[in-house]
Every structure is written in structure tokens, then in C-alpha cells.
């Protein structure tokens, strides 16, 4: 039943409920009408029946009735007269079927004495006057009421073999007011059920016709009233299929106004769809621009990483070259110590130089060769330091490139932040990533500045080393000239020992200066080693930072790609609606 009810349309449910309500109302009204009709009919019938009973009673001689009641068998003549009166009343009153008289007192069995019967009744029943007869219960109920009220009463409608009757009981009283007999008249009551049946049939016909008419009227009214709902259902079906090009007919009644609300909702929904389409297109365009920007940023970061790798390789190469420089400088220092010792020895044996001129000439040649070695070593060291100066300038140029790239990265991060802010809520994640990129760019710029400062210090130290090397080179050249002069005038050594001794002292002094300069060179080279080590560590840190920045840029690219995919999917979903 419940499933069947859910399958019915709203119109069918409404009509069915209306029919049930009408049936309930009409049934209630019919029951009330039938009850009123029955009460009215029974009231009329009772009044007519009592009038009939009074008529029968008036035709009888109550004195004769009282006498016959005393002994129905002995009072034969009076009983015959009484029978004639009963027959006369039965013939005159068409509604009376039979009349009879019973005694007022019951015997031990509850039976009443039959005083007299009308002829028609006597021919039908077996009981005779003077005999006792057990009356039906409903008859006895009316009898009890007559005996208690001492007034006429009637039974309810009943049926027997002779028909449908209502018995009127009229009491016969003596002089003291005691009931001595009861005159009973069976009034034909067949009209009562037949009238009820006709009333019921007519009522049912009226109910059916009324329900049919009311159902048809209700069906037409409800169908017309629910027409907007049918339109609304069709509209909802089309909207569910994605068709927004629909406008329902509007009416001013309570149900018709729903269609106007539906039309307004569709118009607003179409506006929302259009705005969402525009927003999706803007998001798609912005995501593509962000993707291009991230690709450019990624390429820039890769270039920075490549430059930092080259810078770190150069710094490592410089760091590995420094020990070689130190070896050469240490060797020069050892040679200068030997020269100093030799000068001292020459000073001691200057007095005997004439005797060792051959040895002196050899020593002079050896000094010349040694000075050539020193000059070559100083020139090599000068070339190395000059190369270091050139490398430092190249590193400075690279740092400038890093600073420029960091500025570009910062600009790209700012541009990504602006684009993310345009995307509102969906761009919050991109704004965070862009901010992280900007911070990394600022850190990289700061690191580049630190590197530039270190390189500046290195260049300053390198320039000082170049000045010292140039000074040492000049001193070596002076020593060479002195040694050559010593060789040229070696033959005159024996003649000018004192002059040689003085020159040896000068050479010893110059050797001490050269030794001191060599020690300064060692210190500068050690500083260069520390600087190269610092370059290596800094470049490693910058390289790691740039790799992290590259990963961040890749994350931004992935997010931009995801955003582009989401915007395309949103456009596909919105494309299902026809606006």
C-alpha cells in the first residue's frame, strides 16, 4: 500500500484525498440525515400508531372488557360482542393487521391470559380465549412499561410469520385506576424498513453522484492549479540536463508564483555560471603565465647553480694550487738562507780571497745561476698571483651575475605573489611559495654580497702581493747586476778585497731583505689559501640554497600545472550548462 501510494502522482494523491474527505463528510452527513429521518419517521409512526391504538380503544366498551377479562369462557355473549368490535376496528383501520386483548396479570410461568382475539387472528393462531400465552420478550418489555407508567406504549418494530409489526398496548383500568386488561393492536410496520431502504438507496445514489461531480470538479481545479508544478517539474528536468535556456509561465496565484521564483533563480544561476566561466578562464590564463614564469625562473636558477659549480671548481683549483705556491716560496726561502750563509762565509774568508780566486769565480757563477733560479721563481710567483688576481676579478663578475639573477628572482617572486593575490583563496598556497622564493632570493643576494666582500679583500691582498713580488723582482735584478759585476771584477778581487768585503756585506743585507720578503709571500699565500677555502664553503652554501630554490620553483611549477588542470576541469563542468 505504501509503495503504491508513493507511485501516485501529486494530482492523483490530491484527488484521492479529496474523494476520501468528501466521502467522509457525505457519509457523516448521510448518517446524521438518516438518523434524523429515522427519528422523524418513527416519531410520526409512533404518533400514528398511538392514534390507531386510541381509535381501537374507543371502539371497545371498557366495561365489557373488564367483565370478559374476569372469565373469558363464561362471558361468551359479551366476548362475542367484544370480538365484533375488534373485527370492526381491524376492518376500518387499514394499518391494523390484528387486534386482541390480554389480561394484565401474569401467571407463574410469566404467561398472560388471552381475553379475546379478532377473527383473522383467531384463524391463524392456535391459542384460544381463556388460555395463557407466552408473549415475545420485546412485547413483554412494552408490557412492563405499560404496567409501570399505566400509559399506552408500543413495541419496537419486529417481524414474525405474519409480517412486520409494531404492537400498540392500551391499558384498561378499573374504577381505582388499576390495569385489568391490555388492548393490543398490531400495526403494520412494513412501511418502516421499506422507507429506510428507499432512503438509503436514494442517499447512496446522491452520495455517488455528489462524489463523482465533486471529484470531476476537484480534478479540473487541481489540474489547472497544479499546471505550474508540471511546468516546474519539466523545468527542473531540463536544468538537471544542463539546459538553462528555459523560462516558465508565471501566474499570480500561490503555486504559479513558484515559477517566477524558479525563473529568478535560473537567471541568477546563469549569472553565476558566466562569472565562474570568466573566473576559470582567468585562473587558467594566470596559471599558464605562472607556469611560464616558473620555467624561466627555473632556467635562471639552473644557470646560477651552474655558475656556482664553476666558481666552486675554480676555488677548489685555487685551493689546491696554493700548496704548490708555498713549496716554491719555501724553496726560495731556503735558497735565500743559503745565500745569506754564503755571504757570511765570504766575509770571513775575504782576506784569503786572492788565494781562492778560482773557487771564488766558481762560487760567483753558482751565485749567478742561483739568482737566475730566484728570478725565475719570483717571475713564476708573480704570474701565479697575477692569475689569482684575474680569477678574483672573474669571481667578482660571477658574483655580479648572481646578484642580478637574485634580483630577477626576487622580481619573479613578487610577480608570482601578485598573480597569486589575484587568484584570491586558490592562490594562497602560491603566495606562500612565492614568498619563500623571495626570501631565498634575498638570502642569495646577501650571500653574493658576502662573497663580493671576501673577493674585495682577496683582491686587496693580491694587489699587495703583486707589489711585494715586483719589489722582490727588482731586488733580484739588483742582486743579479751585483753578481755580474762581481764576476766582471773578480780578477780585481785580489786587488780590492776590501771592496769585495763591502759588496758581500751588501749582498748579505739584500739577502736578508729578500728572505724577509719571502716570508711575507708565505704569509700572503696562506691568506690566499684561507680565502680560497672560504670561497669553496660559501659557493657550496650558495649552491645548496639555489638547489633548494630550484626545488621551490619546481613545486610552484607543479602547483601551477595543478591549478591549470583544475581550471580546465572547472571549465568542462561548467560547459555542461547551456546558458
UniProtKB/Swiss-Prot annotation:
Q: Does the keyword Lipid biosynthesis apply?
A: no
- Its function? Chemotactic-signal transducers respond to changes in the concentration of attractants and repellents in the environment, transduce a signal from the outside to the inside of the cell, and facilitate sensory adaptation through the variation of the level of methylation.
| Residue numbers on the Cytoplasmic membrane side | 1-13, 220-579
Q: Which SUPFAM superfamilies does the UniProt entry name for this protein?
A: Methyl-accepting chemotaxis protein (MCP) signaling domain
Q: Does the keyword Transmembrane apply?
A: yes
Q: Which UniProt keywords apply?
A: Cell membrane, Chemotaxis, Membrane, Methylation, Transducer, Transmembrane, Transmembrane helix
Q: How does it sit in the membrane?
A: Multi-pass membrane protein
Q: Cite the ranges annotated as topological domain Extracellular.
A: 35-198
InterPro entries registered for this protein in UniProt: Chemotax_Me-accpt_rcpt, HAMP_dom, MCPsignal_dom
According to the UniProt entry, the coiled-coil residues are none
Q: Which residues carry this modification: Glutamate methyl ester (Glu)?
A: 289, 548
Name of the protein in its database record: Probable methyl-accepting chemotaxis protein BT9727_0355
A Gene Ontology biological process noted in the UniProt record is: chemotaxis
Query: In which domain of life is the source organism classified?
Result: Bacteria
Amino acid at each position: 500500500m505504501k509503495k503504491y501510494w508513493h507511485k501516485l502522482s501529486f494530482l492523483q494523491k490530491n484527488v484521492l484525498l479529496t474523494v476520501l474527505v468528501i466521502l467522509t463528510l457525505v457519509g457523516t452527513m448521510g448518517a446524521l440525515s438518516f438518523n434524523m429521518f429515522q427519528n422523524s419517521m418513527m416519531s410520526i409512526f409512533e404518533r400514528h400508531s398511538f392514534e390507531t391504538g386510541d381509535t381501537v380503544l374507543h371502539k371497545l366498551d371498557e366495561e365489557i372488557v373488564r367483565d370478559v377479562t374476569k372469565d373469558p369462557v363464561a362471558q361468551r355473549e359479551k366476548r362475542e360482542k367484544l370480538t365484533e368490535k375488534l373485527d370492526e376496528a381491524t376492518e376500518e383501520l387499514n394499518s391494523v393487521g390484528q387486534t386482541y386483548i390480554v389480561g394484565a396479570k401474569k401467571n407463574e410461568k410469566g404467561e398472560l391470559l388471552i381475553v379475546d382475539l379478532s377473527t383473522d387472528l383467531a384463524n391463524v393462531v392456535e391459542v384460544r380465549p381463556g388460555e395463557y400465552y407466552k408473549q415475545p420478550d420485546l412485547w413483554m418489555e412494552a408490557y412492563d412499561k405499560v404496567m409501570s407508567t399505566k400509559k399506552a406504549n408500543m413495541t419496537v418494530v419486529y417481524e414474525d410469520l405474519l409480517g412486520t409489526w409494531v404492537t400498540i398496548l392500551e391499558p384498561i383500568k378499573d374504577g381505582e385506576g388499576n390495569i385489568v386488561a391490555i388492548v393490543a393492536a398490531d400495526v403494520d410496520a412494513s412501511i418502516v424498513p421499506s422507507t429506510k431502504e428507499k432512503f438509503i438507496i436514494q442517499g447512496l445514489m446522491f452520495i455517488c453522484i455528489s462524489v463523482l461531480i465533486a471529484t470531476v470538479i476537484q480534478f479540473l481545479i487541481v489540474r489547472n492549479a497544479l499546471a505550474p508544478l508540471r511546468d516546474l517539474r519539466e523545468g527542473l528536468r531540463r536544468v538537471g540536463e544542463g539546459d538553462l535556456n528555459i523560462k516558465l509561465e508565471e501566474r499570480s496565484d500561490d503555486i504559479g508564483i513558484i515559477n517566477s521564483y524558479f525563473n529568478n533563480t535560473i537567471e541568477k544561476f546563469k549569472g553565476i555560471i558566466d562569472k565562474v566561466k570568466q573566473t576559470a578562464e582567468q585562473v587558467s590564463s594566470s596559471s599558464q603565465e605562472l607556469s611560464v614564469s616558473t620555467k624561466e625562473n627555473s632556467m635562471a636558477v639552473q644557470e646560477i647553480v651552474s655558475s656556482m659549480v664553476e666558481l666552486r671548481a675554480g676555488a677548489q683549483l685555487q685551493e689546491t694550487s696554493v700548496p704548490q705556491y708555498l713549496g716554491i716560496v719555501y724553496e726560495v726561502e731556503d735558497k735565500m738562507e743559503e745565500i745569506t750563509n754564503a755571504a757570511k762565509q765570504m766575509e770571513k774568508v775575504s782576506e784569503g780571497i786572492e788565494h781562492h780566486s778560482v773557487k771564488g769565480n766558481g762560487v760567483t757563477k753558482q751565485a749567478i745561476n742561483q739568482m737566475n733560479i730566484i728570478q725565475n721563481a719570483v717571475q713564476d710567483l708573480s704570474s701565479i698571483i697575477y692569475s689569482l688576481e684575474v680569477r678574483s676579478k672573474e669571481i667578482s663578475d660571477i658574483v655580479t651575475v648572481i646578484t642580478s639573477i637574485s634580483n630577477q628572482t626576487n622580481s619573479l617572486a613578487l610577480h608570482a605573489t601578485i598573480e597569486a593575490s589575484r587568484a584570491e583563496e586558490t592562490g594562497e598556497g602560491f603566495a606562500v611559495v612565492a614568498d619563500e622564493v623571495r626570501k631565498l632570493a634575498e638570502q642569495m643576494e646577501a650571500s653574493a654580497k658576502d662573497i663580493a666582500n671576501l673577493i674585495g679583500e682577496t683582491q686587496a691582498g693580491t694587489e699587495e702581493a703583486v707589489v711585494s713580488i715586483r719589489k722582490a723582482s727588482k731586488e733580484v735584478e739588483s742582486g743579479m747586476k751585483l753578481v755580474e759585476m762581481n764576476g766582471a771584477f773578480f780578477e780585481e778581487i785580489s786587488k780590492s778585497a776590501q771592496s769585495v768585503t763591502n759588496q758581500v756585506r751588501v749582498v748579505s743585507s739584500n739577502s736578508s731583505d729578500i728572505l724577509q720578503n719571502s716570508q711575507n709571500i708565505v704569509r700572503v699565500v696562506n691568506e690566499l689559501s684561507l680565502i680560497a677555502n672560504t670561497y669553496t664553503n660559501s659557493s657550496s652554501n650558495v649552491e645548496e640554497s639555489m638547489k633548494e630554490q630550484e626545488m621551490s620553483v619546481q613545486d610552484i611549477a607543479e602547483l601551477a600545472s595543478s591549478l591549470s588542470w583544475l581550471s580546465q576541469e572547472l571549465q568542462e563542468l561548467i560547459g555542461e550548462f547551456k546558458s
